[in-house]
Structures are given as C-alpha cells and as structure tokens.
Amino acid sequence: MVALVPGRGCGECNACCSYFEILPELNKPSGKLCQHWKAGCGIYESRPGVCRDFFCYWLQDAALGDDWRPDKSGFIVQETVTDIPAHFSIRKGLVFRLYGEDSAIDSERFIETVSAQVEKRVPVFLSVLGPGNAGTRTILLTDDLTGPVLSRRRERIVAVLHAALATIRAQ
C-alpha cells in the first residue's frame, strides 16, 4: 500500500484524469479529460483499478510543497523503476510528466527540484504527450544535467532542459 501525505488530497486537480490513457476500461485516450469528471470523479466508488491504484508523487512526498500539485505546477510527478539505465546505482527514478505549458520547465521550483535529484544521481526523466494519440515520449535528464548542476550554472541547466524538450517534441 502506498503511504500518502496526511491531509493532502486531489481537491480540484484532475491532471491524471486527463493526461493518461485508460483503455480498455474507460475507452479514454491520453490528453482528454475523462468523461466521468464532474468537479470530482463521478464514478469514484466504482472507478477502474488503474485509477484506484494511481497516486501521483505529490500525494506521497511531503517534501513537495502544495505548489507541486499537478494542476499548479504543470507536472505530474511519478516514481518509476522501469527503463532505469544500468549505470545508475539508484534503481528508482522520477518521471516529470509535463502536463501544463512548456514554460513550466523554466520555473525555479522545477529547476531546483530536478537539480537536487540529479545531484543525488537519481534517474530523472522528462515526459510529454505526443501529438494526437501518439502516446508519451520520455527522455532521461540526469546524465546531460549532471555537469551543469554540479557547476551551479543555471543558464546551462535551462539550456539542457530546453534541448531535451525540443528533442522529445521532435520525435
């Protein structure tokens, strides 16, 4: 069972209800708000297991402040144990799924949080939805960000983030 931060809840946030594909259970494509969202989940008691089992990282980590709620930050943050490159000793990473505007990668909150994880050699990924129903596209950030983060050069960090976003947008 996932441990959740006491007193923290989704509230008006519906980021996961629109970002993720939920097939075949709800026939809901990625990037579209679930048809059952009505100022809250209209099928909460009978929602599919995939919805029942999902908790974004903001609900799990008290270190992420209230401004990290996905609808406020522009990111759905998730832990991951898949696709971690072999050269990482830490086998659990973080995926920052860009949910809002691309400019969210320029926020101090994002840069500081990602930089802190990169400094600890946590595998950090950036993910975006592809056009149409093309699914998600993900890129590892940690390796390319290590030098800029360790040198504390914000302009280089921002340049790497923009290059990574451009790369996955072009895929």
Residue ranges of model-derived segments:
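Short loop/turn segments that flank or connect secondary-structure elements
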Residues: 1-171
